[in-house]
């Protein structure tokens, strides 16, 4: 049989392969963030253009098309550079399915643009089309967050996904408000949608704050205090408090767009910082893992392949099923050449146990989101509801029953086979 150190070396090599995959994924996530930001701006300008009947924002929209196209090309190159062999079978299947859907959406983007330029679409359908494309791109980020095996990296990915999701909802708010102002008249349905978008993005930012570091939380708090956000809050009140069918200032559409854009650009800065922290963490963990590997290989070369006098220590301290503790001064596994092979084995076991517990907590957030999304899908299929209406229905049920949203989602999924389908 191979020596114990040989197995530890194999484990470390697997860890390094996983960290390399995460480093590649973090680069993909960075590129997607830039493309999504460009598409969000393109959507807002498209709504300004459509709501004005083609009389406003054409030059800015065409310039944005060119900028977005550059980022589409970069993302396409990143997609093509993904290494299938580097991804475990189950995760790879999901990731590449997500990438395929996103690539399909990008391939028909020009067709959507042509309909917008011809004023053959309205603002609602256009916003929904861009939202589907952006959701497909963010799903790639979600898949990355759902597959990370390192707790610290997983936490950053969860924070990033929720922040990006909140930013997308803020982008939808920009587009919806631009169209509402440009239409020149308050509309009850559009006002209700704005309120839902504002509420939903705040929930995403709460999750971001839970999983991000203090420096990023401070940046987020500082963003709430800038002058542009105060102006945005004022324009929000105008949009939401104007009675339906009453006039709105058409000229305020540009002010609204600019205020939202200032906020979204600042949010993009936080997103970039979060992505940079993610990439730095990947590099840091990769360096540490390589150091560990070299340390283990050195010990193996020195012939430290057996437990020697420490052999019986495997059974020590096992009253109650506890694992023998490792001294706090042990530090990282690899470079500590004075430690026994026995300690190395238990250090590896203890590290894996701690990682497993922390990952369980991090992934609970992702699992809740999956359940809620599935429950929304059930409502959309059985009640013929839009995604927003399905989410509102779940929230109303949760409030009425005094339960958490995920508890209502679980109950609904359990009853799904018995739900009748309403005719279209």
Language model feature labels by segment:
Residues 1-315, 369:
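Hydrophobic alpha-helical segments
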Residues 345-403, 407-424:
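Recognition helices and adjacent regulatory flanks at domain boundaries
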Residues 88, 244-247, 324-325, 335, ...:
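Proline-rich intrinsically disordered, low-complexity coils
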Residues 11-17, 21, 39, 152, ...:
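Generic structural signal for short, flexible, solvent-exposed coil/loop and linker residues
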């Amino acid at each position: 049989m191979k020596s114990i150190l040989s197995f530890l070396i194999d484990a470390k090599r697997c860890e390094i392969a996983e960290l390399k995959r995460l480093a590649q994924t973090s680069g993909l996530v960075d590129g997607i963030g830039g493309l999504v930001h460009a598409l969000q701006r393109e959507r807002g300008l498209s709504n300004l253009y459509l709501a004005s009947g083609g009389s406003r924002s054409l030059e800015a929209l065409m310039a944005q098309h060119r900028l977005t196209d550059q980022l589409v090309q970069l993302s396409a190159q990143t997609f093509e550079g993904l290494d299938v062999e580097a991804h475990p079978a189950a995760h790879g299947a999901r990731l590449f399915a997500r990438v395929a859907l996103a690539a399909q959406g990008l391939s028909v983007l020009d067709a959507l643009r042509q309909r917008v330029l011809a004023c053959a679409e309205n603002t609602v359908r256009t916003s929904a089309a861009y939202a589907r494309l952006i959701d497909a791109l963010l799903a790639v980020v979600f898949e990355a967050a759902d597959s990370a095996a390192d707790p610290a990296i997983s936490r950053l990915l969860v924070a990033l996904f929720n922040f990006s999701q909140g930013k997308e909802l803020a982008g939808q708010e920009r587009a919806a408000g631009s169209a509402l102002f440009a239409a020149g008249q308050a509309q009850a349905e559009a006002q209700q949608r704005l309120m839902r978008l504002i509420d939903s993005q705040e929930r995403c930012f709460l999750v971001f704050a839970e999983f991000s570091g203090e420096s990023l939380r401070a940046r987020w708090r500082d963003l709430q205090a800038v002058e542009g956000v105060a102006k945005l809050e004022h324009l929000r009140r105008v949009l939401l408090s104007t009675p339906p069918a009453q006039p709105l200032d058409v000229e305020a559409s540009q002010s609204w767009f600019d205020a939202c854009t200032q906020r979204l650009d600042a949010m993009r800065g936080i997103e970039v910082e979060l992505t940079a922290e993610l990439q730095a963490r990947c590099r840091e963990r990769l360096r540490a893992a390589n150091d560990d590997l070299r340390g283990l290989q050195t010990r193996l070369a020195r012939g430290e392949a057996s437990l020697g006098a420490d052999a019986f220590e495997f059974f020590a301290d096992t009253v109650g099923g506890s694992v023998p503790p490792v001294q706090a001064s042990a530090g990282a596994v690899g470079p500590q050449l004075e430690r026994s092979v026995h300690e190395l084995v238990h250090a590896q076991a203890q590290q894996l146990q701690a990682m497993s517990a922390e990952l369980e907590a991090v992934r609970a957030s992702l699992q809740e989101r999956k359940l809620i999304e599935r429950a929304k899908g059930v409502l959309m299929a059985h009640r013929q509801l839009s995604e927003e209406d399905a989410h509102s229905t779940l929230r109303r049920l949760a409030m009425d029953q005094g339960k958490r949203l995920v508890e209502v989602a679980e109950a609904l999924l359990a009853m799904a086979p018995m739900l009748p389908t309403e005719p279209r």
